[in-house]
Amino acid sequence: MAKFIMVVGTSSNSGKTVLVSGICRMLSNKGYKVAPFKSQNMSLNSRVSIEDGEIAVAQYTQAMAARAEPSVHFNPILLKPKGNFISQVIVHGTPYEDRDYNEYRSNKDDMLEKIKESIDYLDTNYDYVVIEGAGSCCEINLLKDDIANLRIAEISGADAILVSDIDRGGVFAAIYGTVQLLPENWRKLLKGFVINKFRGNIDVLKDGFEKIEELTNIPVIGTIPYDETLILPEEDSQALEGKRVFGNLKSPIEVNIVKFSKIANFTDVDPLSSDCLMRYLDFNDDITGDILILPGTRCSTVEMDLMKKHGMDKKIMEFIERGGIILGICGGYQTLGKMLIDENFSEGDVGTISGLGLFDMETTFGNKKAIKNSTGKISIFDQNFDVAGYELHEGYSVSNETPLISLSRGFGNCGNSYDGSFKVVGNSYIFGTYFHGILENFEFRNYLVNIVNNRKNLSKIENDNYAEIFNKNMDKLSKLIEESLDLSKIIK
């Protein structure tokens, strides 16, 4: 049987995801078989599990931290917002149905049974299960329907840790208020407090530690210092609020990313950030970079409509005339074609709309969702290399262009043997693919960046370090947590 540990928070973005990742890596480093778990997550950022099911990217990342094969049991319920208070409900990796909030809440017992199935599976197959809560664990207007926080600790028998972000201010009030608002049976599950993102001399907190322990009879088990050198994947699009420029700020190569209104899988661009200056563009911004990325989105037709309304479509054509390089990923790839056909309005209120017309391609929506871990080979010019990625798309595309990838596994454009499209227009290179994670393949990433390096007479890059950077930072996080927290009474 597994030992269950749960991390809950006083608010959203308090540090739950990072703390779970660090504990998973710490336990894995000690030789234990570890699984992350989040009963219910709401996110447009998802990846594909070992079973070809869809799970939140946070639980996928935590699985990598735990050195575990990502499973649908790590995130049995995934809610993907579609707008108008409706979400696509993913159960054990498979699309279940679309529900509005009231429908979903009234059927929470059905979802709870699915969650219990996963808890039983993890209990049988792992030494430790590290659970992440959602948002604040004491939203008193939601407690009776909350199936993502301390009800899960109660079901699994987990010891719970409450984490709060001191960087926001009011940390002791947040901790005390959270404890007081919890029902007594859930309050008893809390075994310790963690204060996250502290800067400065910890001695200034000691009086606060003593007082909060006196008031709650729960100990502060540690303070995690703020470490701006840690490079960790973001969980969802909230992290993009106010984010404009990031990456290698000294790089002579600039990558622009169109900030779609319903952007999904935005971490696809992260592998470029060590070598390039990265800049998000709003629809009315000018394209200033060498490379333009049209990323994934929940609603391709909506984004295409917005690009037209704000003149981004014309700016993309001017970028092509200047010899720009374009990469469209999933929904962004679909906008590169001639037509996006959505007769049943499955993508939103726009319906059928013409695309950018850079590819001789039509995409039809309303199909069964393709959810695949995919592999194949890119053979363009003198390049010939293997690639891997994952697919999450309901649009099927028929393209008359040169395929970008010959598939050995996957669905690709429309269930044939090919994925993506590739085209050269003058000095411009246009790439499109359904492969999320395409830039994690160092040969393709380097090829893309080196087109610009050649034009600017810069040295070629030969980096293959994305996985290495991830693991280095996870080990650093693990060490930071082990040195900062006293988990001896929780991890037995």
Swiss-Prot record:
GO terms for biological process: cobalamin biosynthetic process. The active site is at C330, H436. Residues 252-444 form the GATase cobBQ-type domain. The keyword 4Fe-4S does not apply. One of its GO terms (molecular function) is catalytic activity. Pathway: Cofactor biosynthesis; adenosylcobalamin biosynthesis. Catalyzes amidations at positions B, D, E, and G on adenosylcobyrinic A,C-diamide. NH(2) groups are provided by glutamine, and one molecule of ATP is hydrogenolyzed for each amidation. Belongs to the CobB/CobQ family. CobQ subfamily. NCBIfam families: cobQ, PRK00784.1. This is Probable cobyric acid synthase. It comes from Methanococcus maripaludis (strain C7 / ATCC BAA-1331).
